[in-house]
Amino acid sequence: MKSVYYWCPYISKVATVRAVIKSAESLKRYSKDSYEPIILNVAGEWNDFKDKENTLALKIINLTNSKILDGKNWTGFWKSRLIYIYLILITFIPLIIFLKKYKPDFFILHLVSSLPLLVNSLFKFKTKIILRISGMPKFNLFRKILWKHTIINIDLVTAPTLGTYNDLKKIDYLKSKIRVLFDPIISPSEIQKKKKEKINDS
């Protein structure tokens, strides 16, 4: 069985979180035990899900003992920047140890991806790295430099829409890496439930 790890240290409940859950659940339901989805709990952000919503018993591994993201909202320009810096500082060494110890077959990066991109480029792990883009990223100077030197060392970049795909495909070093992969937000059971709902005419 191949291992698929998800990296998604979120600072507030955004659509990406639901996309990670549905992606992991889909793998567990439909891969016929070919893949094992595992979510990395970077700093307590997945504690609430693990305790209350993990109906399929997805495997969740703690990367650190920190609970700084557990039930807390770190939105806002300065707060988010400070927490990103803090996360990078406390997870740099644990992430290296984790990748050396567990040797994931696949590592899917969703949020705060700069650290795993950098670590992978420095140590050239054999893990297949997939960068998941949630929306069109803002290309500040730091991201431009980082991506230019790290994207070449990963296997795939996925975009959730054709629009984002077409925009990113214009960047030379992304052309051979970028693919479209729509978010698995709605599950088959939810579709069946919606089909039974009555539509009120107005």
Predicted regions located by residue number:
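Nucleotide-sugar donor-binding and catalytic loop/hinge architecture
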Residues: 1-2, 192-202
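N-terminal strand-loop element at the rim of the active site
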Residues: 6-14, 26-85, 164, 169-171
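A conserved mid-protein helix/loop that constitutes part of the nucleotide-sugar donor-binding site
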Residues: 17-25
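A conserved, positively charged/aromatic
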Residues: 83, 99, 129-155, 173
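Short His-centered aromatic/hydrophobic patch
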Residues: 87-91, 109-115, 133
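Proline-aspartate-enriched helix->loop->beta-strand connector
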Residues: 103-105
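A short beta-strand/loop micro-motif in the catalytic core of glycosyltransferases
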Residues: 107, 153-162
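Carbohydrate-associated surface elements
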Residues: 163, 184
